[in-house]
């Protein structure tokens, strides 16, 4: 679950601009695609259950609300202007900003901690038990040893090194 050097540099550059918009930077995907690259930014909002409700200028309660279109527009404008000034991406690129959604991708091991007991889809770099793709129940996240523990098909438990995870997503369930 490590970002490439280019993605990490972009993440470090973008994070302050995103947070200045009052939202959290959940993660980024930088996908070089020939002449036109794609920079996808995922934003989220941390909900403090103990916080007093906030009433915005329209008289709406903001506590516990997710990411809205207005948040994406604000971040797009802020980050877009910053990227225009610093120009860290050579050539043309498309900038997308969205919430992580129901099937949220995970970019850092710490992000998985809030989803213990839920189903995740994993794509590994190197095969484990002759497989690179798993749908499994997340049992534990070990930050010290940088690994996760999952239950595959309700049958057996696997410990997976986080450095072997190419991609991880939540599997949405009703």
From Swiss-Prot:
Keyword Cytoplasm: yes
Family annotation (InterPro entries): Ribosome_maturation_RimP, RimP_C, RimP_C_sf, RimP_N, RimP_N_sf
Superkingdom of source: Bacteria
Any Gene Ontology biological process: ribosomal small subunit assembly
Keyword ATP-binding attached: no
Localization per record: Cytoplasm
Predominant location: cytoplasm
Any one GO cellular component localisation term in the record: cytosol
Alphabetical UniProt keywords: Cytoplasm, Ribosome biogenesis
Function: Required for maturation of 30S ribosomal subunits.
Family from the record: Belongs to the RimP family.
HAMAP family to which the protein is assigned, alphabetical: RimP
UniProt protein name: Ribosome maturation factor RimP
